[in-house]
């Protein structure tokens, strides 16, 4: 047995032990589970034995002065992995203190501790039809990770199979009410999420404005004031321990009385940065003086209603409403406010806009509450106090030599990844009880893709072309349709998500909206016609299977 085999066995045992805790609350095994087909792997051959491995030294230096800020020698990667890929995995995802026996040093260790945990939890919760299917699942998942076909989001690599809490979700949506206890709890919850390697967003619109009175008779501070404290807290906490900075999103409704202050907040801070930079202060990203500037640790977004956008189009007035009683306390020119928003976004890229009515029209769970906010990157939108674990497919891996798109492998990859992502919710830990309860009840997933631009370039298609848009639309539709089809299949095996029954009508309505949107895709070239044909079939099956089984997941896909 080689050194790598010994390490693999030890790490698999550790990962299996971590996964065994998932057996609490375990569902009864169904009569029939998933059958998993081999696509990439060969029976009797481990994926690791099909590639050549090499040892490398990873030494990272400070670009300013050349000093070494990270060093780990003798790490092991496949010979086809780029230097950049190996550096990222070594510095970000290997666990254990550098220089100790606990430190991971091989990609095999990393993949094994994650994949073995997923397999164990899948078997415990009745996902697979047989032990053979579980073994194929493990090998296929290993092969795809080894060959960079896809990747889970960072918290999976940070936490799964370690002694740390098994936080698997990168994206969280919190809530905050108009009380000091709730505001202070917001700070605490964000800190716990950042510590686990993730990011969080929330809507501050319940907090009364600075133009309203407190019950004691004094004037309220307003949400922008409380943003300052949360921003400072995020700036001191590195996500995942020491691997990356915290990520935040703050949202404010367009009818909040403090909306103008919110819109201009970051633009004013950018003005300060320019002045301080010109005066000789170190204002680079990560510079020693940048911490003196506020609101640099969050993305800001304005939640715009259809009513507001119509007022902008018509040049009308728009009412800002008190948080305490809903009364209009100020009227503004809608077009002027929108212009300020656009100007601020032009100056500093913030705030963004979230279209509230459109978002909620595509909401699969309206009976459980409105969507009021998003995660930091704005691709995940769902109920308050929920989370979403992500995975991203590498589209270039599905481009054939003749420039066709390998739809068969793409569909199989999506099915396997969605299955793995759903399994992770069975063993995942969550930073708060409320988030854990809601996520387990709705099981939101976020499969997506990367390298669309590279795929279009390799295919000879311009971004701004009908052919490029058609291929992108067809691939996205196929991915999402396949994801929801697999979700419906899983519902038939391990049951629909807990919140499905009360939202069944709405969920099925949104699936039909997706089906109609797919029908609106206009294909241009043979490659996107082939992809779109499969997407159309997938959505037909989604509607049919969803009617029969329901769905395992309230959401399935995102695009960051």
Go through each PLM region and give its residues.
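Extended catalytic cores of very large enzyme megasubunits
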Residues: 1-560
């Amino acid at each position: 047995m080689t050194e790598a085999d010994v390490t693999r066995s030890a790490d698999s045992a550790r990962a299996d032990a971590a996964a065994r805790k998932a057996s609490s609350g375990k569902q009864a095994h169904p009569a029939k589970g998933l059958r998993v087909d081999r696509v990439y792997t060969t029976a009797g051959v481990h994926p690791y034995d099909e590639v050549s491995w090499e040892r490398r030294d990873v030494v990272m230096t400070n670009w300013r002065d050349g000093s070494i800020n990270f060093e780990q020698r003798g790490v092991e990667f496949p010979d086809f992995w780029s230097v950049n890929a190996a550096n990222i995995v070594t510095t970000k995802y290997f666990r254990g203190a550098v220089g100790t026996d606990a430190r991971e040093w091989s990609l095999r260790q990393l993949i094994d501790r994650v994949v073995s945990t997923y397999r164990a939890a899948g078997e415990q919760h009745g996902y697979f039809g047989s032990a053979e299917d579980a073994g194929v699942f493990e090998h296929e998942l290993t092969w795809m990770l080894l060959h960079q076909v896809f990747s889970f989001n960072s918290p999976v690599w940070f936490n799964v199979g370690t002694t740390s809490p098994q936080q698997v979700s990168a994206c969280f949506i919190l809530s905050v009410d108009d009380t000091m206890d709730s505001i202070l709890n917001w700070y605490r919850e964000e800190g716990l999420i950042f510590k686990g390697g993730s990011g969080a967003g929330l809507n501050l619109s319940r907090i009364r404005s600075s133009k309203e009175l407190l019950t004691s008779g004094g004037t309220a501070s307003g949400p922008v004031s409380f943003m300052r404290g949360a921003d400072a807290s995020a700036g001191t906490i590195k996500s995942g321990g020491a691997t990356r900075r915290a990520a935040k999103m703050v949202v404010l409704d367009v009818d909040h009385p403090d909306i103008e202050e919110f819109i201009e907040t970051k633009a004013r801070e950018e003005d300060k940065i320019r002045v301080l930079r010109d005066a000789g202060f170190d204002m680079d990203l990560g510079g020693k003086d940048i911490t003196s500037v506020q609101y640099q640790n969050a993305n800001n977004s304005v939640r715009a209603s259809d009513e507001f956008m119509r007022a902008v189009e018509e040049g009308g007035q728009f009412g800002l409403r008190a948080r305490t009683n809903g009364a209009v306390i100020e009227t503004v020119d809608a077009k002027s406010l929108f212009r300020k928003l656009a100007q601020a976004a032009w100056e500093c890229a913030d705030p963004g806009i979230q279209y509230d009515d459109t978002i909620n029209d595509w909401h699969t769970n309206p009976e459980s509450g409105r969507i009021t906010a998003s995660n930091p990157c704005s691709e995940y939108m769902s109920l308050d106090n929920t989370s979403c674990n992500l995975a991203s497919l590498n589209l270039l891996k599905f481009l054939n030599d003749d420039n066709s798109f390998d739809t068969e492998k793409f569909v199989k990859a999506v099915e396997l990844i969605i299955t793995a992502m759903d399994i992770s919710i069975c063993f995942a830990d969550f930073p708060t009880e409320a988030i854990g309860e809601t996520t387990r009840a709705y099981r939101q997933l976020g499969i997506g893709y990367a390298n669309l631009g590279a795929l279009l370039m390799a295919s000879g298609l311009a971004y701004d072309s009908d052919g490029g848009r058609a291929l992108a639309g067809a691939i996205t539709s196929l991915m999402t349709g396949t994801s929801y089809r697999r979700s419906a299949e899983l519902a038939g095996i391990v049951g629909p998500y807990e919140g499905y029954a009360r939202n069944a009508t709405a969920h099925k309505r949104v699936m039909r909206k997706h089906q109609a949107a797919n029908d609106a895709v206009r294909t241009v070239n043979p490659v996107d016609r082939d992809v779109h044909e499969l997407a159309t079939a997938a959505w037909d099956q989604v509607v049919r299977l969803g009617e029969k089984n329901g769905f395992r997941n309230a959401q399935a896909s995102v695009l960051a």
